[in-house]
């Protein structure tokens, strides 16, 4: 069935940098399949803007982490959400696409769906890991879910939610065999000798909580492995500034801080010490041994612990269905423990070979041409809507 010939309008919301990456991938796929006149608007980041996206609000207004930490931003977030819903109901786009940010987007998606506007959500929340009761909210809010991981559609099907497994765009982007030598040349690092990438996060609260511990662990590792070098990507000038007091407190470290280029930094490494998050999947796709860690404020940690179901939080372990890399969380994330675990990952060649096999299988499973699959699923929803009109 052909799509409408009049101008299509698709409203989209991405609430944080990882969502901006996914949404930009989807936009590229849609622009290859929908008329050039299609108007894409809503809330997005720099990657979406590069695709001509019309962002009516700044994405960073929605970027929060943790229960307690979000309290101060709630009034502003509620104001933006209210304005967005009023705009959607007045303009009635052909579909609303929420990209991740479920606590924000599900409310908007339900309002859109109740008004007869198809609602699509890109990235199934981790209901299989914690807060499984959210599946009821999904069933009320979402017409179609675009899933990054292969086991998610079966879970959604039980709740009557239509879905499509589209794979993960990082698996399409990252080559199956990383070029470690080329990455070291790009960063001006020696071709020989051990390199450890350290990624403590990108938010002020993350740096404050885990930054000192990571730097203390690096100091211990350098004592125990004298030839080791460290590389740490700083996504923004503001993040580099946040790191400066920690750098100044450890002048002995053989540390290179890069301006962004986190993927290049991880590619150059022999092992990685990383804060839990999407970046751990990126590290797995780069076939790197790693140690996963995080620290959150005590109350946030207690809430998360009580609502969790899986024994692991890192995506490599979740996808493998078992611990394939170590996780050191909260009070277990001491400098000594992090240093010991990271050096073990660095030195254990047999474990490195095993991880390469596990991560290669994972990579192939997730490599689905996500931009095309996700865009095709959206087009099908639009065609179904036209068929009902």
Swiss-Prot record:
Keyword Transit peptide: no
The UniProt record lists the keyword rRNA-binding: no
Family named by the database record: Belongs to the LpxB family.
PANTHER family xrefs: LIPID-A-DISACCHARIDE SYNTHASE, LIPID-A-DISACCHARIDE SYNTHASE, MITOCHONDRIAL-RELATED
Taxonomic source organism: Burkholderia vietnamiensis (strain G4 / LMG 22486)
BP term (GO), one: lipid A biosynthetic process
Pathway info: Bacterial outer membrane biogenesis; LPS lipid A biosynthesis
Gene name of the encoded protein: lpxB
Reaction(s) catalysed (UniProt annotation): a lipid X + a UDP-2-N,3-O-bis[(3R)-3-hydroxyacyl]-alpha-D-glucosamine = a lipid A disaccharide + UDP + H(+)
Protein name: Lipid-A-disaccharide synthase
One example GO MF annotation: phospholipid binding
Transmembrane segments: none
Job description of the protein: Condensation of UDP-2,3-diacylglucosamine and 2,3-diacylglucosamine-1-phosphate to form lipid A disaccharide, a precursor of lipid A, a phosphorylated glycolipid that anchors the lipopolysaccharide to the outer membrane of the cell.
Signal peptide range in chain numbering: none
Enzyme Commission number, as recorded: 2.4.1.182
């Amino acid at each position: 069935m052909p799509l409408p010939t009049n101008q299509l309008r698709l409203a989209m919301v991405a609430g944080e940098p990882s969502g901006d990456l996914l949404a930009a991938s989807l936009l590229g796929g849609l622009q290859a399949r929908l008329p050039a006149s299609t108007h894409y608007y809503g809330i997005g980041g720099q990657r979406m803007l590069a695709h001509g996206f019309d962002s009516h609000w700044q994405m960073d207004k929605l970027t929060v982490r943790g229960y307690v930490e979000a309290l101060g931003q709630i009034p502003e977030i509620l104001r933006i959400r209210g304005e967005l819903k009023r705009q959607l109901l007045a303009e009635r786009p052909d579909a609303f696409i929420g990209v991740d940010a479920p606590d924000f987007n599900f409310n908007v998606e339900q309002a859109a769906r109740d008004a007869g506007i198809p609602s699509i959500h890109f990235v199934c929340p981790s209901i299989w890991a914690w807060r499984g009761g959210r599946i009821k909210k999904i069933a009320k809010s979402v017409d179609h879910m675009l899933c990054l991981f292969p086991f998610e559609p079966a879970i959604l099907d039980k709740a009557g939610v239509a879905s499509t497994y589209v794979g993960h765009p990082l698996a399409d982007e990252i080559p199956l065999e990383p070029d470690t030598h080329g990455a070291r040349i790009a960063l001006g690092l020696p071709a020989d000798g051990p390199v450890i990438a350290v990624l403590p996060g990108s938010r002020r609260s993350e740096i404050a909580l885990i930054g000192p511990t990571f730097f203390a662990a690096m100091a211990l590792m350098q004592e125990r492995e004298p030839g080791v070098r460290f590389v740490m990507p700083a996504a923004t000038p503001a993040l580099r500034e946040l790191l400066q007091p920690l750098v100044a407190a450890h002048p002995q470290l053989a540390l290179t801080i890069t301006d962004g280029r986190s993927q290049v930094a991880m590619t150059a490494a022999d092992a990685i010490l990383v804060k839990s998050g999407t970046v751990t999947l990126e590290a797995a796709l780069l076939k790197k041994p790693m140690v996963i860690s995080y620290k959150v404020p005590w109350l946030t940690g207690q809430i998360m612990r009580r609502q969790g179901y899986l024994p692991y939080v890192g995506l490599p372990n979740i996808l493998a269905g078992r611990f394939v890399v170590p996780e050191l969380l909260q009070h277990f994330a001491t400098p000594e423990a992090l240093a010991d675990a990271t050096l073990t990952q660095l030195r254990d060649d047999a474990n490195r070979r095993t991880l390469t096999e596990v991560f290669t299988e994972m990579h192939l499973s997730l490599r689905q041409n996500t931009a095309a699959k996700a865009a095709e699923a959206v087009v099908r929803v639009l065609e179904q809507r036209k068929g009902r009109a």
